[in-house]
């Protein structure tokens, strides 16, 4: 199977998000890459489900709380930007202060 670089990136993101989700379910606090991966994955899947940018900005802010991440991680992430494919094309979704 031959994948484009963008498709490889999406698969890597999915793998990291799956790992983060499993660790969160086990009660472990997430680190920076895991937090970014999980938030990004939720936004990408929401776009695939037909949600709009405004909905995804709100959903993205509710994926994780400060209790879900290692101390200091929430301060490191001021915003997350994800390029997602919607029914009407590709758009940039920006989530400000994603971990509250």
UniProtKB/Swiss-Prot annotation:
Main location: cytoplasm
UniProt-listed GO biological process terms: urea catabolic process
Pathway: Nitrogen metabolism; urea degradation; CO(2) and NH(3) from urea (urease route): step 1/1
Subcellular location: Cytoplasm
Gene3D superfamilies: Urease, gamma-like subunit
Catalysed reactions listed for this entry: urea + 2 H2O + H(+) = hydrogencarbonate + 2 NH4(+)
CDD domains reported in the protein's UniProt record: Urease_gamma
GO cellular component, one term: cytoplasm
MF terms in GO: nickel cation binding; urease activity
Alphabetized UniProt keyword annotations: Cytoplasm, Hydrolase
Pfam families xrefs: Urease_gamma
EC number: 3.5.1.5
Subunit structure: Heterotrimer of UreA (gamma), UreB (beta) and UreC (alpha) subunits. Three heterotrimers associate to form the active enzyme.
Family: Belongs to the urease gamma subunit family.
Record NCBIfam families: PRK13241.1, urease_gam
HAMAP family xrefs: Urease_gamma
Protein name as catalogued: Urease subunit gamma
Native species: Blochmanniella floridana
Gene from which the chain derives: ureA
């Amino acid at each position: 199977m031959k994948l484009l670089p963008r498709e490889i990136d999406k698969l890597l993101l999915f793998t990291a998000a799956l790992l983060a989700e499993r660790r969160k379910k086990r009660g472990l606090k997430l680190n920076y890459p895991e937090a970014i991966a999980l938030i990004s994955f939720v936004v990408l899947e929401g776009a695939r489900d037909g949600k709009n940018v405004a909905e995804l900005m709100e959903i993205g802010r509710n994926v994780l709380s400060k209790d879900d991440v290692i101390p200091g991680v929430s301060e490191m992430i001021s915003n997350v930007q994800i390029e997602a494919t919607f029914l009407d094309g590709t758009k940039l979704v920006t989530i400000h202060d994603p971990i509250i």
